[in-house]
């Protein structure tokens, strides 16, 4: 689950008569004071540009990949108002950039087409770009592997040629170069295939895969909740493939029909809900035998070798969390208990399939998954491992048997693993020079680049400028690509040569925002305090008291308060309409240690909301310009849930809410996410009841606008329908705004613009305009 913005608008009169219960006869809301809605029209010109430029990210380099020798950097970039990415290359020595390939050159006048499976996979990965969504470099850096409209292409950097690869018919997903660069593997119609680049012969390495029992594809919860988006892996010598078999025969099937397009077939999905059956997963190993390519070309029905199945205690550890087969290291898998309170790292013998435990992690609440580890050293002597067992994330060096060699990054150093670092935590490992590069910060509103010595654990900080820093390192450790955004700076990207510090900017064609947000990041409240972001109007008048809009997420895995200009562009536009916008990272959000995060265990319905209220009151004590008698709240996904919960449980604080794609009943969300925090429904019925919006529906006493995409395949549209139905039956006045044909990731620029406009009109109506009051600070 993830907070994502973007919604749409329909005529309000339509919802007065629709069957969703958009308007329900009930007693009028009783505000303490009548605040007349502002009559001024909403200027959406900035919003239109914001959406057309993808929040001013279009035109900025993305998916940066240094060549193995560090001589060049390849990257994707679109035009300033386009979602379509093309491929570029920066020469580090000369600083010159050249265009390598555009989608138009490949498609030659035809339109890009995505299969339903590819659309769903991109949804899981939160990829919204068109054209080239990503690419891969061959191990020697000469070839570039790309997909477009479900077809595979190889671009040769040496001669500029583009070749379409002859693959079988069907839906093609997840292509990868083999480590020796001779083959490309991929999933085709639920089975794993390999293409020989020298002969262009294709061979199936698995058979019998179907939509019900698939080979090589990660199951839904692995993609959505474990950050594992692949279901097959090459061996380091390119002679074997390990693949996942996902058996969905006992999993519930949910359908996503599009009422806006009744002639279109429903999209079905295996969707495991709390307490119900999960996908059954097992791992098999199959050989990649060059002699079979010619034989199978002659007889496409020829049998494939029977997989060597890897046994482990699947009853105790049903989740396959991580699979690693690094150069120099053994095949290693991380399996997890359904409770997510225990997981074991297993070493696999690829000749017998037998497993040996390397280490076990336990936590009374839950264990976070870090997809950066284990990271095996190339000499096979040991691996990197991260843990929170001492209360904060730490990085360890362990030997090949799993025994601790030394603590590389102590809990006090602010290490930010992948689940807390908005991306990778381990950025690069330079074994030749003996360094591990990583992200971290003692301040959770920032991320910085560090390096630690593998030999003595000495840590040094690389970046100093306030903001969010990230990097991608070349294979030889000679160069890294540094991306940075700050409180007054949109994302910038540079190639940095480590030996001499030579820094070359990757050129951007992006438009720049017309303003810098006024956002103030403060720490406030009792005890450890809460990080808050406060955005005032650019024409702020200290002698006025402003209605407040809380822009909320407040759930696991997401921080709203960060030192990055791009995070507050929409908040600034909202503030300029006559509001002060506040975001609060309370307990349960990442970046502040195990105990801070684990307080959520057992219930979503209490602590996150308490912390929003506590922080608001603390802000009001020092910022009298905040009119806490007029507070609205809005959010998306978990934030939408929090917005609805706020007006249902605390109408004394929150006077109106816009709830986007809210989870209404946690028994209708997926297993891995929900059970991590709430446990099984049979073991924690009180927690599920306490966390359900349906429990509080009869208590609604404030204006509520529910917004939801009708084709949402993450938080299904049924959540909005259930909540509206409960409110309707309780006689509670509310509004529902369905976003026709949209999923959980709403990408339509017009819809997103109109939704923000509708949100402002809603809050103007129910919160009013700034009023004279006591002087502010």
Q: Regions from the language model: what does each represent?
A:
Residues 10-13, 19-470, 478-479, 487-489, ...:
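Beta-propeller folds
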Residues 4, 46, 125, 223-224, ...:
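Alpha-helical interaction segments
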Residues 63, 229, 252-254, 307, ...:
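Serine-hydrolase catalytic core recognition
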Residues 7-8, 426, 660, 666:
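Intrinsically disordered, low-complexity Ser/Thr/Pro-rich tracts
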Residues 5-7, 106, 554, 737:
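Compositionally biased, intrinsically disordered low-complexity regions
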Residues 1-12:
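Bacterial N-terminal signal peptides that target proteins for export
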């Amino acid at each position: 689950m993830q907070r994502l913005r973007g919604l749409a608008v329909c005529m309000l009169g339509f919802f007065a008569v629709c069957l969703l219960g958009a308007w329900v006869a009930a007693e009028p809301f009783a505000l303490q004071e009548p605040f007349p809605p502002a009559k001024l029209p909403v200027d959406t010109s900035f919003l239109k540009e914001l959406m057309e430029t993808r929040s001013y990210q279009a035109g900025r380099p993305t998916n940066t990949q240094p060549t193995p020798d560090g001589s060049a950097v390849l990257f994707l970039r679109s035009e300033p108002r386009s979602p379509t990415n093309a491929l570029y290359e920066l020469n580090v020595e000369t600083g010159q950039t050249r265009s390598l390939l555009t989608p138009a050159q490949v498609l030659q006048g035809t339109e890009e087409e995505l299969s339903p499976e590819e659309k769903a996979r991109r949804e899981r990965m939160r990829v919204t770009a068109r054209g080239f969504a990503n690419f891969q470099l061959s191990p020697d850096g000469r070839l570039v592997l790309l997909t477009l409209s479900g077809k595979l292409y190889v671009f040769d950097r040496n001669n500029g040629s583009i070749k379409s690869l002859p693959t079988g018919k069907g839906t093609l997903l997840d292509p990868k170069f083999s480590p020796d660069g001779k083959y490309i593997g991929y999933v085709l119609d639920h089975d794993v295939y390999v293409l020989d680049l020298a002969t262009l012969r294709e061979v199936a390495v698995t058979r019998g895969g179907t939509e019900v029992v698939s080979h090589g594809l990660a199951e839904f919860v692995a993609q959505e909740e474990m950050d594992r988006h692949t279901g097959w892996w090459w061996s380091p010598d390119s002679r074997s493939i390990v693949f996942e078999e996902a058996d969905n025969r006992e999993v519930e099937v949910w359908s996503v029909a599009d009422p806006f397009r009744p002639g279109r077939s429903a999209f079905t999905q295996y969707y495991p809900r709390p307490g119900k059956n999960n996908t059954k997963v097992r791992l098999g190993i199959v050989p990649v035998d060059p002699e079979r390519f010619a034989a199978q070309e002659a007889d496409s029905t020829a049998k494939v070798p029977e997989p060597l199945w890897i046994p482990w205690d699947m009853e105790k550890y049903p989740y396959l969390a991580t699979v690693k087969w690094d150069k120099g290291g053994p095949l290693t898998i991380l399996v997890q208990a359904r409770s997510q309170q225990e997981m074991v790292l297993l070493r696999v013998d690829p000749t017998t399939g037998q497993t040996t435990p390397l280490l076990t992690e336990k936590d009374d609440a839950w264990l976070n998954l870090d997809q950066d580890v284990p990271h095996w050293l190339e000499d096979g002597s040991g691996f990197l491992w991260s843990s929170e067992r001492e209360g904060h994330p730490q990085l360890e060096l362990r030997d090949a048997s799993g025994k601790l060699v030394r603590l590389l990054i102590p809990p006090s150093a602010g290490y930010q693993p992948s689940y807390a670092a908005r991306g990778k935590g381990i950025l690069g490992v330079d074994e030749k020079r003996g360094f591990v590069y990583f992200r971290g910060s003692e301040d959770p509103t920032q991320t910085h680049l560090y390096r630690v010595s593998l030999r003595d654990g000495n840590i040094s900080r690389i970046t100093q400028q306030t903001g969010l820093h990230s990097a991608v390192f070349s294979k030889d450790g000679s160069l890294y690509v540094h991306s940075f955004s700050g409180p007054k700076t949109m994302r910038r990207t540079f190639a940095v040569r480590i030996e001499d510090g030579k820094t070359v900017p990757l050129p951007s064609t992006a438009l720049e925002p017309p303003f810098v947000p006024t956002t103030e990041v403060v720490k406030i409240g009792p005890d450890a305090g809460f990080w808050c972001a406060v955005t005032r109007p650019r024409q702020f008048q200290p002698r006025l008291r402003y209605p407040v809009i809380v822009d909320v997420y407040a759930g696991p895995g997401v921080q709203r308060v960060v030192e990055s200009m791009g995070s507050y562009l929409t908040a600034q536009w909202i503030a300029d309409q006559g509001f002060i916008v506040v975001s609060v990272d309370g307990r349960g959000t990442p970046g502040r240690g195990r105990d801070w995060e684990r307080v959520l265990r057992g219930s979503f319905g209490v602590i996150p909301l308490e912390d929003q209220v506590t922080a608001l009151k603390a802000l009001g004590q020092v910022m009298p310009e905040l009119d806490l008698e007029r507070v609205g709240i809005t959010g998306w996904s978990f934030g939408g849930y929090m917005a609805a919960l706020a007006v249902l449980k605390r109408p004394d604080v929150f006077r109106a809410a816009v709830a986007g794609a809210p989870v209404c009943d946690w028994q209708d969300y997926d297993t891995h996410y929900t059970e991590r925090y709430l446990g099984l429904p049979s073991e924690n019925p009180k927690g599920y009841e306490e966390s359900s919006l349906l429990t509080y529906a009869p208590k609604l006493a404030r204006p509520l606008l529910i917004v939801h995409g009708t084709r949402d395949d993450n938080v299904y549209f049924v959540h909005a329908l259930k909540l509206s139905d409960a409110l309707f039956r309780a006689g509670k006045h509310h509004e529902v705004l369905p976003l026709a044909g949209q999923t959980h990731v709403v990408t339509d620029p017009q819809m997103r613009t109109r939704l923000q406009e509708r949100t402002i009109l809603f809050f103007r109506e129910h919160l009013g305009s700034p009023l004279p009051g006591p002087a502010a600070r």
